[in-house]
């Protein structure tokens, strides 16, 4: 099965089996994307066009010498209001510096997603890692701001609707991909569970890099493949949709959560 992505009229693809072909295609893809971009965000070597009106909170005068504690306190007090596309810097407890992007806003909270990919793992290991990430890597001020989020998915991708509550979670396929992409890939699970987020309508916002080498990598989604319990959808390194066995260990775990807005 060949999968690929077009940039400026050029198609970059690989056969899904050859690791060297994957590496060559990934490098060529990044060179093409880099050539089309003019701005590089902090925190990751992935380049991406900065959306109009997007704000890097750390570069505003009030927070240049501040930290995540100041940002969380001002959000709580209503001094700071975030918009979709804004970026919030954070230093994890192990010293790693990451960036969280605002991908959605609702009545009660802001949805933040980590731009970087910290660790690759099997889909079956994600929940255990999420628990560790929440308990051990998040600064206290950020951890205290996170609110439980109801997540819904269809059993085996197209079966009974299941509800769970989570502090850290992975996006659903229906939040990332469009109806047209579901039409073209009938194996995608969780169709209709959510609407596609505006943030993900630009495929460049789906590209994420690993901390280890700064290169784009595939990342897991919550959704199982339609009709299956052991295969899961993912975002490929080029921003398109793909899938893999739940035991594959070279896909990364995304980090997504919601923080409370000021009352």
Task: Briefly describe each language-model feature range.
Residues 1-48, 53:
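Short, low-complexity, charged amphipathic interaction modules
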Residues 43-263:
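Collagenous Gly-X-Y triple-helix signature in extracellular proteins
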């Amino acid at each position: 099965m060949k999968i690929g992505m077009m940039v400026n009229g050029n198609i970059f693809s690989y056969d899904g089996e050859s690791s060297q072909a994957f590496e060559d295609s990934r490098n060529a893809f990044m060179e093409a994307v880099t050539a089309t971009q003019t701005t590089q965000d902090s925190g990751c070597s992935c380049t991406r066009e900065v959306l109009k009106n997007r704000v890097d909170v750390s570069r505003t005068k009030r927070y240049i010498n501040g930290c995540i504690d100041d940002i969380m306190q001002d959000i709580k007090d209503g001094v700071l209001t975030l918009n979709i596309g804004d970026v919030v810097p954070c230093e994890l407890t192990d010293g790693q510096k990451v960036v969280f992007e605002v991908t959605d806003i609702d009545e009660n909270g802001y949805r933040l997603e980590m731009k970087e990919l910290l660790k690759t793992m099997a889909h079956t290991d994600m929940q255990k890692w999420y628990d560790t990430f929440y308990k051990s890597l998040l600064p206290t001020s950020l951890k205290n701001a996170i609110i439980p989020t109801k997540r819904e998915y269809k059993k085996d991708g197209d079966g009974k609707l299941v509800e769970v509550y989570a502090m850290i979670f992975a996006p659903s396929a229906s939040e990332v991909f469009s109806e047209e992409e579901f039409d073209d890939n009938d194996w995608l699970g969780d169709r209709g569970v959510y609407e596609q987020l505006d943030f993900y309508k630009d495929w460049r916002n789906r590209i994420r890099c690993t901390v280890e080498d700064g290169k784009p990598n595939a990342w897991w989604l919550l959704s199982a493949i339609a009709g299956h319990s052991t295969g899961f959808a993912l975002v490929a390194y080029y921003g398109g949709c793909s899938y893999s066995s739940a035991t594959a260990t070279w896909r990364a775990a995304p980090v997504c959560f919601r923080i409370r807005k000021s009352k």
